Regions:
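Conserved GNAT acetyl-CoA-binding A-motif
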Residues: 112, 124, 140-151
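A short helix-loop-beta-strand connector motif used in the catalytic cores of GNAT acetyltransferases and
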Residues: 49-62, 80-84, 113
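Conserved GNAT-fold acetyl-CoA-binding loop/helix
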Residues: 25-48, 93-94
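Conserved acyl-donor/pantetheine-binding loop and adjacent beta-alpha core of acyl/acetyltransferases
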Residues: 78-112, 116
Length: 189
């Protein structure tokens, strides 16, 4: 299958949103402040459209086939920017719902961080996830980072195995919204 990896564009947002939800699961409800799936997806799509939060399309790269179908996504950014991106979201939730939430830090300042990666169900097993990870590594190296990191749910054994094959090391346990994750880091040359 032919595809290209490129910076997400505004017209990709409607295809990006369900893949982010598939990857982050229940975290999406916390990020949006919603309890209903339909409303949560609408709010999550608004976050993807917004330029000032971690899940913005500006932090997202897509694997596109020849007909502009999104086959996979990777959301990534400078670890130092994570807190800044989250403050904007926390402020938005406070203004909209009168609700204060605190979003957990997910990366160290010296890391280029993969926040979310997901390949659509019909494109799995074609190596797209591996290529998205290689792309992230190239981006991080180009930007001068010596570390590429991600967090993976403890129970996602296949994903952990893939990341290990790609050179990531499990460095420490991590908690995100009271759920157990493993922080994994790949040192770049």
């Amino acid at each position: 299958m032919d595809y290209v990896i490129q910076q997400a564009k505004h017209e990709n947002i409607i295809q990006i949103t369900p893949l982010i939800y598939e990857a982050i699961g229940d975290i999406a409800y916390n990020l949006t402040g919603e309890t209903n799936e339909e409303t949560m997806l609408e709010k999550l799509q608004m976050l993807v459209k917004d330029e000032n939060n971690r899940h913005s399309y500006l932090n997202t790269f897509v694997a596109l086939d020849g007909s502009s179908k999104v086959l996979g996504i990777i959301v990534m950014y400078d670890g130092k920017k994570g807190a800044e991106l989250d403050r904007a979201l926390e402020k938005s939730l406070l203004e909209e719902y009168g609700r204060t939430i605190s979003i957990d830090v997910e990366a160290y300042d010296d890391e280029y961080y993969i926040d979310t990666i997901c390949v659509s169900s019909e494109a799995r097993g074609l190596g797209i996830g591996t290529e998205l990870l290689k792309f992230a590594e190239e981006q991080a190296a180009t930007l001068g980072y010596s570390k590429l990191s991600l967090n993976v749910e403890v129970v996602k054994l296949k994903a952990r195995a893939l990341y290990k094959r790609m050179g990531f090391e499990e460095t420490e346990p991590w908690t995100i919204i009271n759920e157990p994750f493993i922080h994994m880091v790949k040192r770049l040359k």
